[in-house]
């Protein structure tokens, strides 16, 4: 369910705006998207796992808030991010 350290480092490297950047909205959204996709796969086999489903909803809400913030601050970065991650909006 969780992402590996290598995958997380790759996401940070790909979406970071500067060297060592782990807190930018782009990086946070990319990591949340990876975790959401992993949990979505988990639910295909474990339909009754409601405890994890609540965590998924929390992650989706957090990602939505970060995306709203990014859209408000810089529409170009927002558009580029949702296109590269394949998030529909």
Swiss-Prot record:
The keyword Coiled coil does not apply. It comes from the Bacteria. The keyword RNA-binding applies. NCBIfam families: S15_bact (TIGR00952). SMART domains: Ribosomal_S15. Keywords: Ribonucleoprotein, Ribosomal protein, RNA-binding, rRNA-binding. Belongs to the universal ribosomal protein uS15 family. GO terms for biological process: translation. One of its GO terms (molecular function) is rRNA binding. One of the primary rRNA binding proteins, it binds directly to 16S rRNA where it helps nucleate assembly of the platform of the 30S subunit by binding and bridging several RNA helices of the 16S rRNA. Part of the 30S ribosomal subunit. Forms a bridge to the 50S subunit in the 70S ribosome, contacting the 23S rRNA. It comes from Rhizobium etli (strain ATCC 51251 / DSM 11541 / JCM 21823 / NBRC 15573 / CFN 42). CDD domains: Ribosomal_S15p_S13e. SUPFAM superfamilies: S15/NS1 RNA-binding domain. GO terms for cellular component: cytosolic small ribosomal subunit. This is Small ribosomal subunit protein uS15. InterPro entries: Ribosomal_uS15 (IPR000589), Ribosomal_uS15_bac-type (IPR005290), uS15_NS1_RNA-bd_sf (IPR009068). Disulfide bonds: none annotated.
């Amino acid at each position: 369910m969780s992402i590996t350290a290598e995958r997380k480092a790759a996401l940070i490297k790909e979406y970071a705006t500067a060297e060592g950047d782990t807190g930018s909205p782009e990086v946070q959204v990319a990591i949340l998207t990876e975790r959401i996709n992993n949990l979505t796969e988990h639910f295909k086999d474990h339909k009754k796992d409601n405890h994890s489903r609540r965590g998924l909803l929390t992650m989706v809400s957090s990602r939505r808030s970060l995306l709203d913030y990014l859209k408000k601050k810089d529409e170009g970065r927002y558009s580029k991010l949702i296109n590269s991650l394949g998030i529909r909006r």
